[in-house]
Amino acid sequence: MIFNSWDYYLLFLIPSAILCRLATPERRPWVIFLSGGLFFTYFSYTQFGGVVGAACLGIFLWESLVSRFYKPASWVCWFGVTQTVLFLVLFKYRNFLTGLVWRDAARNPLYWKHAFLPLGISFFTFEFLHYAVDRYKNRTEEGSVAEYMAFILFFPTMVAGPIKRYQDFLPKLRAISREWVVDWQRGATRILTGLVKKFGVADVLTAYTNHLNAADIARAWRPMLLVWLFAYGIKIYADFSAYSDIAIGSARLFGIRVPENFDWPYLRTNITEFWRHWHMSLTNWLIDYIYVPLGGSRRAGGRVYANILVTFLVSGIWHGAGVNFIVWGMLHGVMLVIRRMWRRVRPLPAGGPPPMWSQLGSWMLTYAGVNLAWAFFCMDVHTASYFFRRLFVG
């Protein structure tokens, strides 16, 4: 984890935040751009560090020239989207996709033995796609090359989000707060909160919840399997929200506020509310760029359900290259479809909130469903299936 290294704070965060505060408005984007480039190169494979920076710049310059000198056309938008997706597929999904055809890696002519993931590729790919689509739809201004590269290479959010929007980031970049004391106090507090979650909760539970295999499942007392699953749910929430806390706090040191990502999702009483409060920047991105373009809730019932399933198929694939992540995403899609069907049959009472016992039952069902689905997030499909057979059958 980059966020728990002294190098992150002493070599990058503190010096860059101070320089950004002292820089003129014209030079701030360059400070963020250059510090982000150095950060990326330092914490990734240095022989590939320049490749991604060049790709970022190339994609932006292409879209910039088109939007400046030519009337935007749909093929330009699709070209930008396609090249960005291919870039992600090449690095993240190549071995997984070719492995579906050639199960034996030794016989796979397309297998990339030394495959690696460029730092933050899943996050900055979604930011690329957002920019390409929103520029085409004129939902955001173009900005300068330095401002765009500062947006992409803003290193506090590069590793683990939150996923930013250009039109939200740009005004904050141009009008950085001069309230040093308040920003640094709140930023440092948020960073410390994240570190406590990471070391005091997530890492403690990691020793217990990680590396569960079929032999462990076979030996375990069945009720302990359920305890293990709920412990993993707490661990992954503490882990993910810790990254977000540190990223949000780090951005605050620059005087820039980025989107919140987690808002007590496990306290929500239905799966819809859970996703409105879990990884919120990702959920909003999926709604705006997958669900709504597919037709959203404007279509007939069956089409709406299909839109939900496709959206969460994308969510699963985004989280990881494996069939288990697809299953995990589809399980959440199915839960959302069932919730929507149920509300068509049993609408919420018009006279006020549901009774307490109903809310409690709904919360328990949601909490159980979310945690049971985690099995496919942390295990391959075969091991997760055996886990459930052992848990429910014996």
Regions from the PLM with identified roles:
Residues 1-394:
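Membrane-embedded transmembrane alpha-helical bundles that form the catalytic cores
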